[in-house]
Amino acid sequence: MADAPHIPDEAETRARWGDFEWTPANAIKVKEIIGRYPPGRQQSAVMPLLDLAQRQVGAETQTQGWLPVPVMEYIGAQLGMAYMRVYEVATFYTMYNLAPVGRYHVQVCGTTPCMLRGSDDVLAACKNKGLVKGHTTPDGLFTLTEVECLGACANAPMVQINDDNYEDLTYDSMSAVLETLAQGGQPKIGPQIDRQTSCPEGGPTTLKEMVSENHDYRGRWNQPA
């Protein structure tokens, strides 16, 4: 998490997470994940295990989850990795949170396409709702982070909130997304304007049948001319 301070390995953290272990359901998932790799290559499973652990911590704390030091040590021991190697992976990728976050982790893209298309307005909407970069709101609901490219440049500006993208945002639509979440609702995922995925704003110019239905054109491709 780019803007958040790293949580030190303090006694309170160890008291809370020192006895971390997989839930029965997640233990089955871990076995399946490690089984994807050849014998002796189990360390390749470190990324999906970190993600799974973060989600388990999130479920236990009713937040988006994070990775306390004892949890990373637990994963390292299971995979035969030094803790520092696990930590190196966790600190490289911004989808791993090294500090507690709120129920909704609001990640605002601030790179060039989003900046040119209005990411400052998106951040202003967040600020108006009481969100501060690198911090969690007092009610524990939102954590705001400014991140690098999230891969939806054609739909700039955009944010990722937990596992969902909200795209083609304005000040007003970002405010509405946050308000809906604060009220316990689920905003529309994806483009916040009248647009199908990343098609032109005026609508698609080809394959128009796919606008209203998941039309499968492959049957036509296989027909003789």
Language-model regions: role of each:
Residues 1-225:
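Signature of N-terminal electron-transfer/Fe-S-associated modules in redox systems
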